[in-house]
């Protein structure tokens, strides 16, 4: 067991001071948290600096904080921002470590068993270990996570109890230390020295923690006593300094001691006998044979190695949980008084609520056909009410909070003023009769001023027809549809910003990474057709696409005024009035955001010296494509090493596109 440091303070480092209505939002949020309020909503308009406000709140309340985002890309962006704000504190990243994941499944209609197939990202696995170890060692921790944080992880008590604690002067034999390391799933390898491994050279044991990627520790013995412990560069062996205490955390989150393992194996065997009897009674002899063979193999592996592939499916027995009891998750690694912040809560809470059912239906099929014991059903994500039971205090952050958040609390704190003085755009409604020619005139007016236009339609056919028509009219236009790959999508956004074309047509322009300051006009076709993209939240989010330009304007083409349209227009007008009053009072003139146009191709500069080469990938022969993949893979690892996961994901998608050509 390790002692957690509880007196560290968060230290926020920023060249900015809170401005606009940030000071009031920060003060209200902090007062409510310190006053014991369980849930509150930060309703911040696009571009008002919500992440900065969140950072100020974390620094002032000084609580370990879990920030949950609805996808890896957004989690990566937030992680980078929090890292900049808190360079002297533990800012951690916890997302699914699979680059590729095909879950275990069975399709009875075709009698097809799909074995679990996955590719684990070593860098992200390291960061997950770094997150859990930081939570057990200190209190000044921010973990930025995706919804994978509600999936089963392993007992924090077993994880903490298994820590191997070393210090100079400790009486322990070298062989005892080696056994202890093997017990916590470290692997001896005297040649290939990397994370989760150790090597032995006479009286010296070198250990490479699972949460590190560059530094290892050299433990030097004098007889049966530790003489000294030194931190070294894993690659060169260069000594970086001596340490007076070293805590080695397990190399896997699913760890249990020998006594607990024997109890778990006995329970697995008992459950196996029970399930075999059930299958035989039902005449399911094939299922019984399949289950017996698979489970007995896993039991043998657990007995001999303490681990087996798919060990998480036995986590109920290994953790000593009862049937139906929720699994341990990342949330259990936090102390009781931690703070949760849900970013883009209108999206994230929907994911959290929906995870359980999808996982359950897939696993029930595996259990019914003899691929897994029924206890595998308890290796699962948390149900909504189980997640809620972990909540001590929570802040939902969104420009458009969902129904769920509004049901949880009446405390809504608004953040409407942008530091740049930018206003929410003006919104007008025009009839659909003659809408295309009307829109053409508006586009041409924008082109003359070197500004850009977004057009959002409801159907693929309309988007394609509109794009073709505008091209005939001499407009430089592109259509962004769902089939476009990630890298190509980012290139399209870049080209729009550079003025390679002036108009972007799409169906769903709400996805992340689509904010373009040069866009001064957003046209919403079929605005009166109620649905996901034309409800109040969808319309407000779409209107927000024009909120980064001082000339921002939105035109809704519709023949009737729906309630969603009216509410979205009223809310935008309300925010705009508040922003205008603030600007007038403080003499602020709105300024279009000056955002650097990042050279998206530069991520692959060494492999692809110029843009022309990326376009002509099809002309490369098989060997040239193979060489390019090798170079790109090196750059992907480099980007991941620099914690630029968005960049790494873009390069990965390019690699997949090149591989698909063979």
Curated annotation (Swiss-Prot):
One of its GO terms (cellular component) is cytoplasm. The keyword Zinc does not apply. The gene is uvrB. It comes from Streptococcus gordonii (strain Challis / ATCC 35105 / BCRC 15272 / CH1 / DL1 / V288). This is UvrABC system protein B. Forms a heterotetramer with UvrA during the search for lesions. Interacts with UvrC in an incision complex. NCBIfam families: PRK05298.1, uvrb. Pfam families: Helicase_C, ResIII, UVR, UvrB, UvrB_inter. Residues 626-661 form the UVR domain. A motif (Beta-hairpin) lies at residues 97-120. Residues 31-188 form the Helicase ATP-binding domain. Gene3D superfamilies: P-loop containing nucleotide triphosphate hydrolases, UVR domain. It is found in: Cytoplasm. Residues 435-601 form the Helicase C-terminal domain. Belongs to the UvrB family. One of its GO terms (molecular function) is ATP binding. It comes from the Bacteria. GO terms for biological process: nucleotide-excision repair; SOS response. The beta-hairpin motif is involved in DNA binding. ATP binds at residues 44-51. The UvrABC repair system catalyzes the recognition and processing of DNA lesions. A damage recognition complex composed of 2 UvrA and 2 UvrB subunits scans DNA for abnormalities. Upon binding of the UvrA(2)B(2) complex to a putative damaged site, the DNA wraps around one UvrB monomer. DNA wrap is dependent on ATP binding by UvrB and probably causes local melting of the DNA helix, facilitating insertion of UvrB beta-hairpin between the DNA strands. Then UvrB probes one DNA strand for the presence of a lesion.
């Amino acid at each position: 067991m390790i002692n957690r440091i509880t007196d560290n303070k968060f230290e926020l480092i920023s060249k900015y001071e809170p401005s606009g209505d940030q000071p009031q939002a920060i003060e209200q949020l902090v007062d409510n948290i310190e006053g014991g309020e369980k849930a509150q909503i930060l309703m911040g308009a696009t571009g008002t600096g919500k992440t900065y406000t969140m950072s100020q709140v974390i620094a002032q309340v000084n609580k370990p904080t879990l920030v949950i985002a609805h996808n890896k890309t957004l989690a990566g962006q937030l992680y980078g921002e929090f890292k900049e704000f808190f360079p002297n504190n533990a800012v951690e990243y916890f997302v699914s470590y699979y680059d590729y994941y095909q879950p275990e499944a069975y399709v009875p209609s075709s009698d097809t068993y799909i074995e679990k197939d996955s590719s684990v990202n070593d860098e992200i696995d390291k960061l997950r270990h770094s997150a859990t170890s930081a939570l057990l060692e200190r209190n000044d921790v921010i973990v930025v996570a995706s919804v994978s944080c509600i999936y089963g992880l392993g007992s924090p008590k077993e994880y903490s109890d298994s820590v191997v604690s070393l210090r100079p002067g400790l009486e322990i034999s070298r062989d005892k230390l080696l056994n202890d390391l093997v017990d916590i799933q470290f692997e001896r390898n005297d040649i290939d020295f990397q994370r989760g491994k150790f090597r032995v050279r006479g009286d010296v044991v070198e250990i490479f923690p699972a949460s590190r990627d560059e530094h290892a520790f050299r433990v030097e013995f004098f007889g049966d006593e530790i003489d000294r412990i030194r931190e070294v560069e894993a690659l060169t062996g260069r000594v970086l300094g001596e340490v007076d205490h070293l805590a080695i955390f397990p190399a896997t989150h699913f760890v249990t001691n020998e006594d607990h393992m024997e109890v778990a194996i006995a329970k697995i065997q008992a459950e196996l006998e029970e399930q075999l009897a059930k299958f035989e009674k039902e005449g399911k002899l094939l299922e019984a044979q399949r289950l017996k063979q698979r489970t007995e193999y896993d039991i043998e592996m657990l007995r001999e190695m303490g681990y087996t592939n798919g060990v998480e499916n036995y986590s109920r027995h290994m953790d000593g949980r009862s049937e139906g009891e929720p699994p341990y998750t990342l949330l259990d690694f936090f102390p009781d008084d931690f703070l949760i912040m849900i970013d883009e809560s209108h999206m994230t809470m929907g994911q959290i609520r929906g995870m359980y059912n999808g996982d359950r239906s897939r696993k029930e099929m595996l259990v019914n056909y003899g691929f897994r014991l029924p206890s595998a059903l308890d290796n699962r994500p948390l149900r909504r009410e189980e997640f809620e039971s972990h909540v001590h205090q929570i802040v939902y952050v969104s420009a458009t909070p969902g129904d769920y958040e509004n049901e949880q609390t009446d405390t809504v704190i608004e953040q409407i003023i942008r530091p740049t003085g930018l206003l929410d755009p003006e919104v007008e409604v025009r009839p659909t009769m003659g809408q295309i020619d009307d829109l053409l005139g508006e586009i041409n007016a924008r082109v003359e001023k070197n500004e850009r236009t977004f057009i959002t339609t409801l159907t693929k056919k309309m988007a394609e027809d509109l794009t073709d028509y505008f091209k005939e009219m001499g407009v430089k236009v592109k259509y962004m549809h769902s089939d476009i790959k990630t890298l190509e999508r980012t290139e399209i956004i870049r080209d729009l910003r550079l003025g390679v074309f002036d108009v972007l047509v799409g169906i769903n322009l709400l996805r992340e990474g689509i904010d373009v300051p040069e866009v001064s006009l957003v046209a919403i076709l079929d605005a009166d057709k109620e649905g996901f993209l034309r409800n109040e939240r969808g319309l407000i989010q779409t209107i927000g696409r024009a909120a980064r330009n001082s000339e921002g304007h939105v035109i809704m083409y519709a023949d009737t005024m729906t309630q969603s349209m009216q509410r979205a227009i009223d809310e935008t007008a309300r925010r705009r009035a508040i922003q205008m009053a603030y600007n007038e009072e403080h003499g602020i003139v709105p300024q279009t955001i000056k955002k650097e146009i990042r050279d998206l191709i530069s991520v692959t500069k060494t492999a692809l010296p110029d843009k022309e080469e990326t376009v002509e990938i099809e002309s490369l022969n098989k060997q040239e494509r193979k060489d390019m993949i090798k170079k790109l893979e090196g750059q992907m690892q480099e980007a991941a090493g620099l914690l630029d996961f968005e960049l790494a994901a873009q390069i990965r998608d390019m690699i997949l596109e090149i591989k698909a050509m063979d």
